[in-house]
From Swiss-Prot:
Its main location: cytoplasm. Converts seryl-tRNA(Sec) to selenocysteinyl-tRNA(Sec) required for selenoprotein biosynthesis. It comes from the Bacteria. This is L-seryl-tRNA(Sec) selenium transferase. InterPro entries: PyrdxlP-dep_Trfase, PyrdxlP-dep_Trfase_major, SelA-like, SelA_trans, SelA_trans_N_dom.
Length: 465
């Protein structure tokens, strides 16, 4: 064993070779030294346990190659591009909405250059960073004003902290939602320092339930859109319009957490109907919060629209500065909202809506291309078929609603082979993320953004054998 330890080169010896000097030039002295120490520590452990050298210390060229590979891998960003073939278009784990081309360009400009973020070019003086987005939302929804923070949970927190800290907020028991990551409305209320007052039952809440709970300490009446679940059957809920009338009677604001935040009626595209921001405003809600990276199709943000005097109070709260968006997000959000000024062009320019509305025939053509490519690469090892599929919007939007789609399925009696193929998909330079149903890998085309790029990536399957 001692002889094996003696075969290990010193860090200094590696650094003083021409190859080592080249690595220092490329990656820097500290990084190369740390890498060599790491690999030598690995080698010593292997010698202790297995009584042999690791392969990369059996030959000096292998050693240099391993150091180079390790250092190059350190430079690789781990949040990397993937091919989404899950059939879930707004996939939370894969980053939700893909930005439109104009949003990408606006964000890139904001990254590279100084921009008029809080500067009024006409007046030549300081302005507010939310102004451009607020003006657009006023035009698109009819809201008096708007406020932007970094996500919808932050928007709800800001509303509660501003208007209900130390006071009570009344909400239906059937609307105490939990979203991903065990994140619950009651937890946000507790964090905001307000008291939750539940009324009604899980499946039925009446206007009188709210009325009986109102007292001198009631600060808000709250509605939460249950976008990620449905209660069916013997049910009853109070509409915003009814709640607003009750709020006016007692001079209590009504706030609505709309969640997904559609700015256009999805049913016009033969998609499942989702309440729009405009509809909630017409019903009289004082403040409405919603997400920017779900149905709206933009960057992650929490948007609050509503009455000007209430928005001004939100803007003045200390939490607003904590939760505010940076120039890149605001630039991308502005560009995304401007697409809604041309509604006839939305399915062409808004990426998420384009994916959701792709014709089945187009998806079938893509499926045929994908099947042909896979048959060529996988030979006769697997059974490939083109099948009808059911995709979904994702991100908690309309979870019960399915969207017709087309998928390529891969079957194999040996489940270990399917598992191995899935692993190969994930090791590609741009990993392929699929789903498994009924002992088949299902590659759903509804969520694919670029079939040509996917086909090129698949060529790597020939190289990993």
């Amino acid at each position: 064993m001692t002889a094996l330890f003696q075969q290990l080169p010193s860090v200094d010896k590696i650094l003083k070779t021409p190859q080592g000097e080249q690595l220092v030039t490329e990656f820097g002295h500290s990084a190369v030294v740390n890498c060599c120490r790491h690999l030598l520590a690995q080698a010593r452990e292997k010698i202790k346990i297995e009584k042999k050298l690791p392969h990369f210390f059996t030959d000096f060229n292998h050693t240099i190659a391993e150091v180079n590979r390790y250092l190059a891998n350190q430079q690789q960003v781990k949040i990397k591009s993937v091919h989404n073939l899950t059939g879930t278009v707004l996939h939370t784990n894969l980053g939700r909405a893909l930005w439109a081309q104009s949003a990408q360009q606006a964000a890139l400009t904001a990254m590279r250059q100084n921009v008029a973020l809080e500067y009024d070019l006409e007046a030549g003086k300081r302005s507010h960073r939310d102004n451009y987005v607020s003006e657009l939302l006023h035009e698109l929804t009819g809201a008096q004003a708007a406020c932007v923070v970094n996500n919808n949970a932050a928007a709800v927190l800001l509303m509660l902290a501003t208007f209900a800290q130390g006071k009570e907020v009344i909400i239906s028991r059937g609307e105490l939602i939990e979203i991903g990551g065990a994140f619950r409305i009651p937890d946000i209320m507790a964090q905001a320092g307000c008291k939750l007052v539940e009324v009604g039952t899980t499946n039925r809440t009446h206007l009188n339930d709210y009325r009986r709970a109102i007292n001198e300490n009631t600060a808000l009446l709250m509605k939460v859109h249950s976008s990620n679940y449905q209660i069916c059957g013997f049910t009853c809920e109070v509409s915003e319009q009814e709640l607003v009338e009750l709020g006016k009677e007692f001079n209590i604001p009504v706030v609505t957490d709309l969640g997904s935040g559609a700015l256009t009626d999805l049913s016009r595209y033969d998609l499942p109907k989702e309440p729009t921001v405009q509809e909630k405003l017409v019903q009289g809600a004082d403040l409405i919060s919603f997400s920017g990276d779900k149905l709206l199709g933009g960057p992650q943000a929490g948007i609050i629209v509503g009455k000007k005097e209430l928005i001004q109070q939100l803007q003045s709260h200390p939490l607003k500065r904590v939760l505010r968006c940076d120039k890149v997000i605001l630039a991308a959000m502005e560009a995304t909202l401007r697409l809604y000024l041309q509604p006839e062009k939305l399915t062409e320019k808004l990426t998420s809506l384009r994916l959701l509305t792709q014709p089945l025939e187009q998806l079938r053509q893509q499926a045929e291309q994908l099947k042909a490519k896979l048959e060529n690469l996988l030979k006769d090892d697997f059974l490939l078929q083109i099948e009808s599929s059911l995709a979904q919007i994702g991100s908690g939007s309309q979870p019960m609603a399915k969207i017709p789609s087309i998928a390529v399925t891969i079957a194999e009696k040996n489940s270990e082979k399917l598992t191995a193929l899935l692993a190969r998909f994930k090791k590609l330079s741009t990993p392929i993320i699929a789903r498994v149903e009924n002992d088949k890998i299902r590659l759903d085309l509804r969520s694919v953004t670029a079939i040509e790029t996917l086909l090129i990536t698949l060529e790597e399957l020939n190289q990993d054998q």
